[in-house]
Amino acid sequence: MKQNFAAIILGGTGQVGGAAVAELLATSECREVVMITRKAIAPRSRVRAVVLDTGAADFAERTAALARGVLSQGPVSAVSCVGVGSGSTRWSEEELLRLELGVVGAFARGCHDAGIAQFCLLSAAGGTARSRFRYVRVMGMKEDTVRNVGFARLAIFRPGIIVGNAHTPAWVGWLGSLVPGSFGNIDQRILGRSIAAEIAWHSREAGEITRENAAMKKLAAQFNSVP
């Protein structure tokens, strides 16, 4: 059952975040999308951009204050679409940790402190803190960081190769079409739609759920078929 809701999103100006915002706005029950950004963006209907310094020591507190205001108008869910994707090879592990754990962790804590119950987290296929591979390991550490915040509902999205994305080279998408299962291709619009569906349909459920490619595609198709 759908209900009126708002979403507060970090990373909404990126490729995947933009797809999630578009799918949320396509849902009539979404009253507002609040985007935390580092700089001002062009005005859009039902979108409120709030400029915050994500690297500031009080970022969590400022997020909490913002979230409380949005919650005063009705149900709110939080979304993190932060990620560097294919650009991760150019980042040091320290830089990745500062973004994926530091910034995302502070955002999550602020949302939780404000009283938001549902958090949607963009991760990556195979994410585990025990991995030998740096990017996958950092994704797993990010999941653990948000998990430890204690949301009543945590939805983790683990896409494989994201296509329809300016950051994904064509040859990588071709390679992904040959890879079966959770590490293969998924279109960013489907990923965004599955996030919108999670918020619209499952915000009042409890517990943690992890969705990989097949589950995201199924949920997005179900959501798309509902008038």
Predicted feature locations:
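Short beta-strand/turn micro-motifs composed of small residues
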Residues: G11, T37, S123, R158
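N-terminal Rossmann NAD(P)H-binding glycine-rich loop of SDR-like oxidoreductase domains
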Residues: K2-E29
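A structural signal for isolated positions on well-ordered beta-strands in alpha/beta enzyme cores
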Residues: A6-I8, E32-V34, F119-C120, A155
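Oxidoreductase cofactor-interface core, primarily capturing Rossmann-like NAD(P)-dependent enzymes
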Residues: S28-R31, T128-P227
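Conserved Rossmann-fold NAD(P)-dependent oxidoreductase catalytic core, especially the SDR/UDP-sugar
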Residues: V84, R90-G140, N148, A155
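Short, polar loop motifs at secondary-structure junctions
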Residues: M35-A42
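NAD(P)H-binding glycine-rich loop region in Rossmannoid oxidoreductase-like domains
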Residues: A7, M35, R48-A106, G110-D113
